[in-house]
A protein has these predicted regions:
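Bimodal "functional hotspot" detector
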Residues: 2-4, 8-10, 16, 20-566
Length: 566
């Protein structure tokens, strides 16, 4: 029997296999895969080896499912391959995530569809929207169908990827100061292990992040034979080799912080015991058991400084905040006018912006502010990051300008010349390293990210195409703000009407928080691990606050500007 005579089956039939019931699908044409949301993450995919007498289509289905299981170097998946390629296949080269189907093509079976992204050998996801065609090269060996043309790496449907892979983070030290900056990783759930995390650390940051961070682990360092293991108390012992002698306190402190924060991606990890060349390695701040505790490293985590979750804003020309019942409470009684306001993440500093050219009043919350004449006209975006105020507007000649202002009133201009378009909205993360940006390019608004280097230059722009459910690309974005370490809230369209989406900065996930009744022109979020404090403002001043159960509550008080701390 030829593969052509086999019934073509949907790639998503992996779900059917999991449930133990296979339904025949006609070969007269492709069947579009139904995109399933990632909310079902955590379903265990347990592929089975090929059985005697399996049809060609069942062999392809089984192989596509088995590629989700890396156990014993993809032992099950290799059993679906012909003997000539079984040992040559390199599944760890990369993972291609796709939406597609399997259909008959000539005398064989082909996978056809569109890629959604690629995960490299380290675990970094890159969005990729390309046409995909793969012929499995079905052959018979001893009367059984086998795949003779496996892919370069692994092919996973979006459905299987969402359920068999999990997320982790590899942290590096911000060039801008004492802070760790995460690089998202996507790994098979069974490989979220201390050893795999340390390997990602040794590989260093990817191209995008590298301009804004540095690796505290010296070049040439290797994972030792003892590897990395976690005990029942949550302490990870990491054995390294090749660490240079004579590292100073600051270098060893950063090495420990970077490693430990990365290992904290694993649930219940609480500490690090480092061994170098077979001997315990002293890390500044470790306890008498030579364990560096995660609780002692909070200063490296910018989000740990989050204070109040109050929503601030401007109502009738005055800065204030909303009470529990969303009534307005002015911040001061001096009657100072304000058009925009911002509060630092820890609540220590407050700023207001008013006038054109814009005047900034900035200083300790509740204290006497200093007044700064910025010279900006049409100021349109303001927020705090790393203890400084960031203000976007235009100069006297109409050119776009981005300024940072210290609480002492010192002003620095930021070089935007490396960006390939005009900034429509801008938000710097809590570490002061990564900028989420909406750029106007060729008449369209593009979402992407860039890095702040040397405190005064935005470089390394990388567009991140965003796709919501049902394969709808986000468009007409108007505003954004960071909701956490790796997620950004974006107001955009996915069809008709505006909605608020929480998107991963690498484009790997897009979550729709639901449409809003008003037409929003601004979004603000409190950057914290939960990422659940989001609010939007409409042009008429209507303010909507996101509720955790998925609805939007309208505030009693209309405002002309809104801002969560940070």
């Amino acid at each position: 029997m030829s593969p052509r005579s086999a019934l073509t089956r949907l790639v998503a039939a992996a779900l059917t296999l999991l449930l133990g019931a296979c339904t025949d699908i006609p070969t007269s044409g492709p069947v579009t895969e139904v995109t399933v949301s990632a909310e079902g993450r955590g379903v265990q995919i347990a592929p089975e080896p090929p059985q005697k007498g399996m049809s060609a289509s069942r062999i392809v289905e089984g192989f596509l499912q088995a590629m989700a299981d890396p156990t014993s170097d993809y032992e099950v998946a290799r059993q679906y391959l012909s003997s000539s390629v079984r040992g040559q296949w390199a599944p760890r080269r990369a993972t291609v995530v796709y939406d597609g189907w399997v259909e008959a093509a000539g005398d064989g079976l082909e996978l056809r569809g569109t890629t959604r992204g690629t995960v490299d050998a380290v675990g970094r996801f890159t969005v990729s929207r390309e046409s995909l065609t793969h012929d499995f090269g079905l052959v018979q060996e001893a009367g059984e169908w086998r795949v003779s043309a496996p892919p370069e790496g692994v092919l996973l449907s979006s459905y299987i990827f969402a359920r068999s892979y999990d997320s982790a983070r590899s942290y590096f030290i911000a060039r801008s100061g004492q802070a760790v900056v995460p690089e998202p990783l996507h790994l098979p759930a069974s490989e979220i292990t201390p050893g795999r995390i340390v390997e990602a650390q040794l590989a260093g940051p990817g191209t995008f992040l590298s301009s804004g961070v540095r690796n505290a682990i010296p070049a040439g360092t290797r994972l030792g034979a003892a590897g990395a293991v976690v005990d029942s108390s949550g302490v990870v012992t990491v054995a390294l080799e090749g660490v240079p002698q004579g590292l100073g306190d600051v270098e060893r402190r950063e090495l420990g912080a970077q490693l430990l924060w990365s290992l904290s991606s694993i649930p219940k990890v609480s500490g690090l015991h480092l061994v170098v060349d077979g001997r315990p390695y002293p890390l500044p701040g470790q306890n008498d058991k030579q364990v560096l505790e995660l609780s002692s490293q909070q200063d490296y985590q910018p989000l740990s400084k989050a204070g109040s979750a109050d929503l601030y804003g401007v109502h009738e020309g005055r800065a204030g905040k909303l009470s529990a019942d969303t009534s307005f409470i002015p911040l001061t009684s001096d009657g100072a006018s304000a058009e925009m306001t911002a509060i630092s993440l820890d609540g220590a500093f407050t700023a207001t912006v008013a006038g054109s050219p814009a005047t900034v009043r900035i200083g300790p919350s509740g204290g006497a502010p200093v007044q700064v004449d910025t010279g900006l006209i049409r100021a349109g975006s303001v927020h705090f990051a790393q203890g400084r105020l960031w203000l976007l507007g235009r100069g006297s000649s109409g050119e776009q300008r981005l300024l940072s202002v210290s609480p002492q009133g010192e002003v620095a201009a930021i070089d935007l010349s490396a960006l390939p378009g005009e900034v429509m909205d801008f938000s710097l993360d809590a570490s002061g390293t990564r900028a989420a940006v909406l750029l106007g390019i060729g008449g369209a608004t593009r979402f992407g990210a860039a890095s702040l280097i040397e405190g005064n230059r935005i470089v390394g722009w990388q567009e991140v195409p965003l796709t919501a459910s049902q394969e709808k690309e986000l468009s007409d974005a108007v505003a954004l703000d960071w909701t956490g370490e790796v997620n950004v809230a974006v107001v955009a369209s996915a069809g008709s009407g505006k909605s608020v989406f929480v998107v991963a900065v690498d484009g790997s996930e897009v979550t729709d928080l639901g449409p809003v009744s008003a037409s929003p022109v601004q979004v603000t979020a409190l950057p914290r691990p939960g990422g659940d404090a989001v609010a939007v403002r409409a042009a008429d001043g209507t303010v909507l606050l996101y509720e955790q159960h998925g609805t939007w509550q309208q505030a009693k008080t209309p405002m002309t500007w809104i801002s969560y701390p940070g």
